[in-house]
Amino acid sequence: MEIQGTRFGTLEFDEKEIIYLNEGLLGFPLSKQFLMFPYGEDSSFFWLQSVDEPEIAFIVINPFDFFSDLEFAVEDEDASSLVLARSEDVEIFTLVTIPEGRPEEMRTNLAGPVVVNVQNRLGKQILCKDYSPRQPLIPDSMRSQLKEQARSSKGGHVAGGR
């Protein structure tokens, strides 16, 4: 199978690679089939590419790579709809937003993780009221350093003169 996307051009894939989000994502109810692939080599980021609407792609992460103390509770109803039998069959991803020109301010939506049953490729975005929908990925101390580095590299120095 293949899709023609605006971001990646032609993507060839096998049907068994599709993740099925039968309820779509919040704000994107028509996108129900997705492909997921690494953002880059050795990256903690992934692309979640809509098969139904090829112009739509999201950056996602495994939030446990960034926040070791997270605990997401999958309600029985959600587990049932995903046909989850074992916790080992679950992978969880969160959507990332990166403000244009301000990557140091990237955030992830911990309040709306996407839960995927890796055995049957069924997924669902669930709601977690205990977490922020705009959780910074970069600690405040590092953000300040990155902003300062960006400012100094933009400003540059003019040499010469009389």
UniProtKB/Swiss-Prot annotation:
Keywords assigned by UniProt? Answer: Bacterial flagellum biogenesis, Chaperone, Cytoplasm, Translation regulation
**A Gene Ontology CC term for this entry?**
cytoplasm
- Biological processes per GO annotation: bacterial-type flagellum assembly; regulation of translation
Question: Does the keyword Nucleotide-binding feature in the UniProt annotation?
Answer: no
Q: How does it assemble?
A: Interacts with translational regulator CsrA and flagellin(s).
Q: Which PANTHER family match?
A: FLAGELLAR ASSEMBLY FACTOR FLIW
Q: What is this protein called?
A: Flagellar assembly factor FliW
Question: Which organism is this entry from?
Answer: Magnetococcus marinus (strain ATCC BAA-1437 / JCM 17883 / MC-1)
Q: Which gene encodes it?
A: fliW
